């Protein structure tokens, strides 16, 4: 990886303002998912290092909390500016460790930076309340204060944005943080904290611990000094972490799995729906929590939509993320490839029609062909399992009530999409879909000013928006005798 600023490539963890190795001297290798090439390594840390990071965050808490909201905002603003100044290097680093096309990586860096900019300002607007007192000799006030030491466990699919979406509101609220990034993509996290240090974030305010996830996670969920955990990842792991946090009654934010439906009604703009479907399905090779898992297409437009969709998917360029023109990169690991293949095999064995793709790409490695399946019916695993790959599954429907019932028939409730030009239908369908986010006539829904999160088993809490900082605050009631 060729960077303009070589100091952004860090192969050590960051605890209390110092770059450090694991106590045992061991490390975890990091590879390019496109070709398996060795990129570098990071420390294989465990419980002892996690405890030191937690203690460092706790020691830094008083000083950071004592700064005014404006002072914290100035530091965060500088962090935001540094991300944009180094966006090309950060994008290159991400493409090589995560695999996504360079233009998508660059988009993620700007997206990640937007959360820092947003929450730098939101920290100045943590307002309280004055309550009219029922007693003449009392004055009742409500203030909000940062919750304290926070922990974040972040995924590999958005290795920069999932960190800033948690760290920015935490720091803006006066909290400190310990971050455990995914072992597949640690370099993005370490580059971010290198820039945070340059921006003036004091030692201990933000820490990154790499290594053994279960051991580190057990400390982040079990240590009494940690008052809040934020996790983005799978529902099974989120369920486990939530249970571990129960022992010390931690506040928990969870952004978990999805099973997003994409509905094309008979009055939809078909060309617009096809373009929206491409983005909502194949971005990041289908490896996002809000990627479409199930396409429901009305009988009246099924053939037309399917023909055009297959035509457009066939045009997608698969390759290394750094290559010009690449639209789809590799899956993250060989296990991901095997999972996608097993879901396709299950569907075709049960009668699905293979319209395009269906197997690992000729490029080898972790590349997989963009795939379209038709004739999907109940009982096929991919209707309930999160695919997390470049596979589109198409289902016919004939009425609004039928498709809403089908769309809601899942444990998940993160994102949903639909295309229609009937304004009455738009409101009715949007309100009836059991999802935390609904995209209407668009396949892109996320930004820093909107609340991101799901319902049911897709999670708890919201990230981004004016609501995102609330998860890092405690409400305190003051009763004054006068």
What are these regions (language model features)?
Residues 39-45, 60-66, 152, 262-265, ...:
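Short, well-ordered beta-strand elements within core beta-sheets of diverse protein domains
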Residues 36, 72, 94, 116, ...:
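Residue-level signal for inorganic ion chemistry
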Residues 228, 236-377, 440:
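ALDH superfamily catalytic-core signature
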Residues 128-272, 397:
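Rossmann-like NAD(P) dinucleotide-binding subdomain of oxidoreductase/dehydrogenase enzymes
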Residues 35-41, 226, 263, 317, ...:
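Conserved C-terminal structural/oligomerization subdomain of aldehyde/semialdehyde dehydrogenase
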Residues 37-126, 137:
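Glycine-rich loop-to-alpha-helix module at the N-terminal edge of alpha/beta enzyme cores
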Residues 1-34:
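Hydrophobic face of amphipathic alpha-helices that form TPR/SEL1-like repeat modules
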Residues 61, 65, 80-87, 91, ...:
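Structural signal for hydrophobic packing residues in well-ordered secondary-structure cores
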């Amino acid at each position: 990886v060729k960077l303009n600023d070589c100091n952004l490539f860090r192969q050590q963890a960051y605890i209390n303002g110092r770059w450090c190795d694991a106590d045992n001297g061991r490390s975890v290798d990091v590879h390019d998912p496109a070709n398996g090439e060795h990129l570098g390594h990071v420390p294989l840390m465990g419980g002892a290092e996690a405890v030191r990071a937690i203690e460092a965050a706790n020691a830094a808490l008083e000083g950071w909390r004592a700064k005014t909201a404006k002072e914290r905002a100035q530091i965060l603003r500088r962090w935001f500016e540094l991300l944009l100044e180094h966006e090309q290097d950060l994008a290159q680093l991400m493409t090589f460790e995560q695999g996504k096309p360079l233009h998508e990586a660059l988009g993620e860096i700007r997206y990640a930076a937007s959360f820092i900019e947003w929450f730098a300002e939101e920290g100045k607007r943590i307002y309280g309340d004055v309550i009219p007192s029922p007693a003449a000799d009392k004055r009742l006030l409500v203030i909000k204060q940062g919750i304290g030491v926070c922990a974040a466990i972040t995924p590999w699919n958005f290795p920069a944005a999932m960190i800033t979406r948690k760290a920015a509101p935490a720091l803006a609220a006066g909290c400190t943080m310990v971050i455990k990034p995914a072992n597949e993509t640690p370099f993005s996290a370490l580059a971010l904290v290198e820039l945070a240090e340059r921006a003036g974030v004091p030692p201990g305010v933000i820490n990154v611990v790499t290594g053994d996830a279960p051991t580190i996670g057990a400390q982040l969920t079990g240590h009494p000094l940690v008052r809040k955990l934020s996790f983005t990842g799978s529902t099974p792991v989120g369920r486990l972490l939530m249970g571990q946090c129960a022992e010390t009654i931690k506040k928990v934010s969870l952004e978990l799995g999805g099973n997003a439906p994409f509905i094309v009604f008979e009055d939809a703009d078909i060309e617009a729906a096809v373009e929206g479907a491409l983005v909502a399905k194949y971005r990041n090779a289908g490896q996002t929590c809000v990627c479409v898992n199930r396409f429901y297409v009305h009988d009246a437009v099924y053939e037309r939509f399917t023909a055009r969709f297959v035509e457009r998917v066939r045009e997608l360029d698969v390759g290394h993320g750094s290559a010009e023109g690449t639209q789809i990169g590799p899956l993250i690991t060989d296990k991901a490839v095997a999972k996608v293949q097993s879901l396709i095999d299950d569907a075709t064995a049960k009668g699905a029609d293979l319209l395009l793709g269906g197997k690992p790409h000729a490029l080898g490695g972790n590349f997989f062909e963009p795939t379209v399946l038709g004739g999907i019916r109940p009982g096929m695993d991919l209707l309930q399992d999160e695919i997390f790959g470049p596979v589109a599954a198409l289902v016919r429907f004939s009425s609004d009530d039928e498709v809403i019932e089908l769309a809601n028939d899942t444990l998940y409730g993160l994102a949903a999409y639909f295309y229609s030009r009937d304004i009455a239908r738009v409101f009715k369908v949007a309100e009836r879909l059991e999802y935390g986010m609904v995209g209407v006539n668009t396949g892109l829904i996320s930004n820093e000013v909107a609340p991101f999160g799901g319902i049911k088993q897709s999670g708890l809490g919201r990230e981004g928006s004016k609501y995102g900082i609330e998860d890092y605050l405690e409400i305190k009631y003051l009763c004054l005798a006068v």
